């Protein structure tokens, strides 16, 4: 589990390698990730955008930006959480993801809530110990 807090918005990520959607012989690897966004602040906030940075094992960076998440722009009152699951395909057996969600408070303040850096590991990853 990976977690971070920005301005009392806690973002937690769980990842899972999905072998039935992966084929090492075809350099096709797939992970599911579940994100939970918890509003621990005293203000209602709305998630209006996302910015993902996805890096594969070769260091190739892909950035994905867009409105909302999974077709929604959830509004979170104080104490509420929103959870969703999505997926990430790569052509390498491991990688990392990070990014941010654009949040707007009920007062109109806009800020970026950090998504923690999390690893995408598979049984095909070469483990290196320093």
UniProtKB/Swiss-Prot annotation:
* Disulfide links within the chain: none
The domain of life is Bacteria
Q: Which gene encodes it?
A: apaG
- Which HAMAP family does this one have? ApaG
Q: List GO BP terms, alphabetically.
A: error-free translesion synthesis
Matching entries from InterPro entries are given as: ApaG_domain (IPR007474), ApaG_sf (IPR036767), Uncharacterised_ApaG (IPR023065)
A Pfam match: DUF525
- Entry's transmembrane regions: none
Write down the species. Answer: Beijerinckia indica subsp. indica (strain ATCC 9039 / DSM 1715 / NCIMB 8712)
Protein name as annotated: Protein ApaG
ApaG domain: which residues?
A: 3-127
The lineage is: Bacteria, Pseudomonadati, Pseudomonadota, Alphaproteobacteria, Hyphomicrobiales
């Amino acid at each position: 589990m990976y977690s971070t807090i920005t301005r009392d918005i806690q973002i937690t990520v769980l990842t899972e390698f999905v072998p039935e959607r992966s084929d090492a012989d075809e350099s096709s690897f797939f992970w599911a990730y579940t994100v939970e966004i918890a509003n621990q602040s005293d203000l209602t906030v709305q998630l209006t955008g996302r910015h993902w940075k996805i890096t594969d094992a070769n260091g190739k960076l892909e950035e994905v930006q867009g409105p909302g998440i999974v077709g929604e722009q959830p509004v979170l009152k104080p104490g509420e959480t929103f959870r969703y699951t999505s997926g990430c395909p790569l052509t390498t057996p491991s990688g990392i993801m990070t990014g941010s969600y654009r949040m707007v408070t009920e007062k109109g303040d806009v800020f970026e809530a950090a998504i923690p850096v999390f690893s995408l590991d598979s049984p095909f990853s070469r483990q290196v110990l320093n």
